[in-house]
Amino acid sequence: MSQLSVNAIRFLGIDAIEKSKSGHPGVVMGAAPMAYDLFTKQLRINPEEPNWINRDRFVLSAGHGSMLLYALLHLSGFKDVSMEEIKNFRQWGSKTPGHPEFGHTAGVDATTGPLGQGISTATGFAQAERFLAAKYNREGYPIFDHYTYVICGDGDLMEGVSAEAASYAGLQKLDKLVVLYDSNDINLDGETKDSFTEDVRARYEAYGWHTALVEDGTDLAAIDAAINEAKASGKPSLIEVKTVIGYGSPNKQGTNAVHGAPLGAEEAEATRKALGWDYAPFEIPEEVYADYRQNVAERGAAAYDAWKQLVEDYKQAHPELAEEVAAIIAGQDPVEIKLEDFPVLENGFSQATRNSSQDALNAAAKVLPTFLGGSADLAHSNMTYIKEDGLQDDAHRLNRNIQFGVREFAMGTILNGMALHGGLRVYGGTFFVFSDYVKAAVRLSALQGLPVTYVFTHDSIAVGEDGPTHEPIEHLAGLRAIPNLTVLRPADARETQAAWYLALKSQSTPTALVLTRQNLTVEEGTDFDKVAKGAYVVYETGADFDTILLASGSEVNLAVAAAKALAAEGAKIRVVSVPSTELFDAQDAAYKEEILPNAVRRRVAIEMAASQPWYKYVGLDGAVVGIDQFGASAPAGKVLEEYGFTVEHVAEVVKNLK
């Protein structure tokens, strides 16, 4: 029976890829046995309740093998993945896109495809489970008690981000993380002997992982025994399973020819004969469905029903905690952040926005019990430390400060996993110039609709002495180009509070907070509520203005100072703070006209970054005081002067407008 069910996975993959004329059959054919054992013997999921908070998580880190996952979801009874959807693999509007997409297909726990990120995301799942278990479980009530399983390939383990995350997971002793390594000695370009020869298990043992080897990837009993041993090890686990890529294909198995292209009609037929699969394309015998129904769906439904009863009993035993757990189960924050949770700020107060961020962050931490995060070894520079808590590790699971180490990329992917898990509000910080290291994870935050907050400090050439390696130039433009990402560059402490408030209210959009090292004065015109509009008026000489200055962040202080200097000479001028171009662009036409009247063509944008994003606002008649070259090393005041960020230079640019 099991062999028939394993082959059903293989041939759903072969047939769907053949029909779409696109896909990666090799991993589906080679990894089918381990995936079958995982789903039917280990994984605790309920196809009728795909979002069950305490389900085991499964991450196909080798996302190019998506038909492996879709086949399993279909056979297990997930309604989203009907046979019609299998036939529509990689087609417009289907539930079976080329790589798995969270939120698009029920049963997909994480978007994967960019190699390495799946393992790292799974690390976040495991850390989220551990924190929530420590927070809410009580004796006899394991409300949060699940494993996170991964299937990865050689390519995943070559990627640096998987090494970052594995090092971190070993340090944290995330013992509910189990990785099955589909070790087939083949990559897209040929054999791994030409590109990847280290002893992977020895490397993972050095990270503090339990490791095991299954020499025959078709031996279901050996695979199952290895998983059980891993779960009892007390460590994160890597199980190397030796497989044959394209298993069963007489002429292509064991070669890179089967990695990323359909078998072809002739080879698909030959594989049917070789594996004894006497069924037409997309035909699955009823006994296979019965196998998956009994061993995945019914087993999972029983586990879900038992858990639901446990939650009901928990309500009686621990009513206050149960209220928070009920909110988490419903996909809500256990406590709602309110405006009054932030301190009142007076005009003229001067503080770096990174410090203002720490004040807002700590105010939120006092209210939100499941708000946690950290920094890539820069907590006391990024100001991301929750003062009332210590560092989280295996011995201190309830602490909310996470020391990610100098692992920016892994930090982002781990945060994604924690956000995907549900029940948490998470953040991570680094210097803005190093946002490039984490950008691929930020992109997946946005693609998956995850409300992760990224805290990027030291946001401009005002860093000064550290020089061009540490002075962001193109970074704002790059982040603003990512769809479904809100970039907020607040002008002062008041706008910083508002930025945090918006980030903590977000349900499906990540936020990048871009913050200063240098002090900024709270302007009289800044407004907590108006930050949500993305742009608003902070200063004007009167209703008859004929010039508009636009600025973000620290340059709002400069814009107001320049406007006042020009006003003293008789200029009629308005200053607009633009903390978020994304939020402003989302406003209706009437509001945009109110803030930037079309009739007023004399416009100057001021930002210590690449000028590119501003031309859509200033037009052909306006100007941008920006930076389209790298920075320099010198005291900050000197750098700002040399690059033209002075009242005198801004005033000169305004006077030169037509």
Where are these predicted regions, by residue range?
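A short, small-residue-rich loop immediately preceding and capping a beta-strand
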Residues: 20, 56-57, 108-111, 141-159, ...
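Thiamine diphosphate
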Residues: 91-103, 127, 131-134, 140-145, ...
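Short glycine-enriched loops at secondary-structure junctions
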Residues: 89-95, 375-381, 388, 406-409, ...
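Flexible, small-/acidic-enriched active-site or ligand-binding loops
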Residues: 470-473
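Conserved acidic/glycine
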Residues: 1-32, 151-152, 156-157, 178, ...
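Cofactor-binding active-site loop characterized by glycine-rich and histidine/acidic residues
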Residues: 30-172, 385-386, 414, 418, ...
